[in-house]
């Protein structure tokens, strides 16, 4: 799978990788790495004018890396924000004797100023479209009623309700935000709408408050107040009180929620609601990397119920989740099960089957696209019919796998190739420059590598036979893909010292003599080496630390 290409992937030199030192490297380690590279790239060591020019440029790059990492202040900036952090406006006013913590605070201040200038550009739109479909004629059809009716051979599927809501946010200051929202609903030919305006203020790091004003054609004006407060680091409370004006008078309402973190993954909620539908609700929610579990109990008028639900999260690229729940109360019993899966970078598709008494059988399809939600509840039957349950379960699965194989997967593959091609075109000049720099570095290494090989051969030490870096294609179905690996035998041999080769946890593309042959794609380093006269082989991930020789890399030739 292709990795995301950041803006800094080409522009930001990895100074640690260039010097081949750990991010926690001491001053002595930095100095030793700097001296070794200076001996390799010093312009005075090369007489050929072309090599001398290339050596001078590489020497300056190594010197720049050492200057940044050897200074505690610039190193702190680089560690936190990269090379772009060093170039950010405003650092000229920072005192030279600041600590890393003070530097972080200064950078965050500069970032806040930049964010404030972009406040007006953020609206954070959110929307929901719900379309209720009545498909009961598919399963609850009485044939005798339609025998004498012309054109009644096809079941009637109707849209019986719709709901549309939308909201936007407009940041006024760093602590004040205006929120405008509206909704329209219709059911069986009757409908209405409302519009709301809210003003939210963050009062402190522990809380915020929100004033709400609303009006609609079916209900009168609405005035509300919402408060949030962190009582302790593990406990918070929210309160929402509202006054709804109507022809029948004023209807007050109050909702209070008290929540507490019971442990790292578990939160307990206690809710009290007073007004039109008074109730007391308590629930426990446990959310981990692989599961989500909820148990709830509500006592209220007119609804009282108990709920238990479980969701399993698969650790795959598509973020697949399966879920099931049981809800029982005065209104009846409902069993629901379903699944959801990521179908693109910003889209999640889900489906659930609801089986209840007296509700019947329903199929619910939901698509989340960024901050927009599209919801389609399809009512199949008022009765508990096995055929309805079967088709509600099997139908979406068959349809999804057919669409995924015939439409979604080819589309995503084409989009991925298009993005990669666009990246290659936009970075072609930079890649060519990096390639030329790497080739120049390899030419400058030749004499040093020759001496290293002679020394290693004399003691039966570490000899790099072959080394390749880039994207390896192992799947036979992808053999037609263009080879995207480069030979890095010489650069790796140049890093051998005392029959050892140690590479740190960083992208190998930043090492001297290396470059990225396939920007935006996953890369590996494959090394075939000889130690004590025995062949060894290892394959390492791009950012994986590597230490050779190792006994586990030995190639078994006994068979």
From Swiss-Prot:
N-acetylalanine is found on 2
UniProt keywords, alphabetically: Acetylation, Chaperone, Coiled coil, Membrane, Mitochondrion, Mitochondrion outer membrane, Phosphoprotein
Show the Pfam families listed in the entry. Answer: DnaJ, DnaJ-like_C11_C, DNAJC11_beta-barrel
GO cellular-component term (any): SAM complex
Domain named J is located at 14-82
Protein family membership: Belongs to the DNAJC11 family.
The protein's job, in short, is:
Required for mitochondrial inner membrane organization. Seems to function through its association with the MICOS complex and the mitochondrial outer membrane sorting assembly machinery (SAM) complex.
Record protein name field? DnaJ homolog subfamily C member 11
Q: What is the lineage of its organism?
A: Eukaryota, Metazoa, Chordata, Craniata, Vertebrata
């Amino acid at each position: 799978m292709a990795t995301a290409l950041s803006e800094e992937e080409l522009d930001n030199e990895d100074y640690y990788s260039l010097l081949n030192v750990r991010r926690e490297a001491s001053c002595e380690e930095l100095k030793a790495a700097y001296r070794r590279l200076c001996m390799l790239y010093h312009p005075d060591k090369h007489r050929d004018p072309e090599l001398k020019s290339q050596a001078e440029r590489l020497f300056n790059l190594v010197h720049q890396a050492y200057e940044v990492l050897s200074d505690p202040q610039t190193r702190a900036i680089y560690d936190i924000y990269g090379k772009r952090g060093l170039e950010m406006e405003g650092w000229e006013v920072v005192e030279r004797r600041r600590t890393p913590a003070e530097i972080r605070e200064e950078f965050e201040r500069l970032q806040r100023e930049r964010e404030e200038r972009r406040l007006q550009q953020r609206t954070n739109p959110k929307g929901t479209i719900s379309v209720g479909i009545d498909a009961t004629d598919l399963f609850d059809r009485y044939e005798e009623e339609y025998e004498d009716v012309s054109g009644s051979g096809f079941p009637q599927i109707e849209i019986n309700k719709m709901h549309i809501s939308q909201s936007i946010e407009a940041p006024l200051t760093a602590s004040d935000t205006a929120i405008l929202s509206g909704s329209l609903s219709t059911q069986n030919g009757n409908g209405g709408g409302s519009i709301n305006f809210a003003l939210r203020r963050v009062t402190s790091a522990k809380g915020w408050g929100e004033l709400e004003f609303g009006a609609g054609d079916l209900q009168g004006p609405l005035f509300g107040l919402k408060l949030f407060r962190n009582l302790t680091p593990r406990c918070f409370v929210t309160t929402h009180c509202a006054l709804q004006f109507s022809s029948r008078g004023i209807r007050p309402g109050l909702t209070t929620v008290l929540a507490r973190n019971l442990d790292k993954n578990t939160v307990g909620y206690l809710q009290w609601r007073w007004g039109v539908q008074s109730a007391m609700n308590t629930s426990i929610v446990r959310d981990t990397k692989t599961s989500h579990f909820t148990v709830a109990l509500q006592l209220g008028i007119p609804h009282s119920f108990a709920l238990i639900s479980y969701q399993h999260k698969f650790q795959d690229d598509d973020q697949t989740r399966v879920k099931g729940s049981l809800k029982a109360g005065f209104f009846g019993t409902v069993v629901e099960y379903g699944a959801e899966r990521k179908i693109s970078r910003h889209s999640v598709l889900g489906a659930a089957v609801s089986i209840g008494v007296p509700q019947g059988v329903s199929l619910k399809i939901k698509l989340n696209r960024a901050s927009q939600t599209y919801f389609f509840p399809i009512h199949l039957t008022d009765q508990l019919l096995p055929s309805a349950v079967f088709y509600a379960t099997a139908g979406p699965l068959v349809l999804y796998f057919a669409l995924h194989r015939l439409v979604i997967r080819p589309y995503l593959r084409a989009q991925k190739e298009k993005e990669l091609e666009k990246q290659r075109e936009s970075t072609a000049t930079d890649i060519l420059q990096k390639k030329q720099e790497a080739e120049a570095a390899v030419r400058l290494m030749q004499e040093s590598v020759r001496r290293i090989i002679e020394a290693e051969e004399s003691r039966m030490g570490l000899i790099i036979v072959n080394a390749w870096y880039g994207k390896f294609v192992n799947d036979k179905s992808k053999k037609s893909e263009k080879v995207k690996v480069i030979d890095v035998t010489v650069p790796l041999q140049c890093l051998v010292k005392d029959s050892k080769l140690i590479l740190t946890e960083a992208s190998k593309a930043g090492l001297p003599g290396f470059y990225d042959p396939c920007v935006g794609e996953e890369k590996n380093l494959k090394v075939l080496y000889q130690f004590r006269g025995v062949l060894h082989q290892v394959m390492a991930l791009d950012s994986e630390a590597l230490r050779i020789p190792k006994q586990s890399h030995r190639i078994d030739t006994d068979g």
